[in-house]
Amino acid sequence: MAEPLVSETLWRRVEPLLPKPKVRNRHRQYAGRKPSHPRKILRGIVFALRTGVPWEYLPATSEWPSGQTCLRWLRRWQRAGVWKRLLVELLSELARPGKIGWERAIVDSASVRVPHGGRNTGPSPVDRRKRGSKHHVLVDAQGVPLELVLTAANRNDITPLLGLVDALPALPGKRGRPRKRPDRVQGDRGYDSERHRQELKKGSSPS
């Protein structure tokens, strides 16, 4: 049997983080369809992100609403901080027993083509100037993703580095105060900058 797109475990994680729906006035008549259940919306979001199907080509089915509806709720939940809180919860569960590799963090980026453009897109210098975005990711020593920033594809790798490190959440550990800085930050030549090195030394040692 195929693994469900939204398992019970995932849904139990996400549901408490979703904004509470507004209570409708029972004396007012509402036209149109009944709102989709949030779990169905999440199922459509996960399907689109896993397959890469454009939102406008994702049809409404018995499993999820239309792609445009899923995209609208994805953005709404993003603005509400749902995904950030989910990440912090998961990282905290790893940090409490000491499973976050704070001895070093590795930063890197990858460009992704975005044919239709939009926010955080720009001409890619590595893809014949086609429009795209760049994903900047910071992971711990074991490859656990700690933070991610999205920029236009024509932004330099090092531009969001300080913001990426500063955005790390304070995570509880086995003892002492919560921690949010790795001992060392490592990157390739694209991150070689004396100014950034000095800034990072205030809280961690770059390589």
Residue ranges and their predicted role:
Residues M1-S207:
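Short alpha-helical elements
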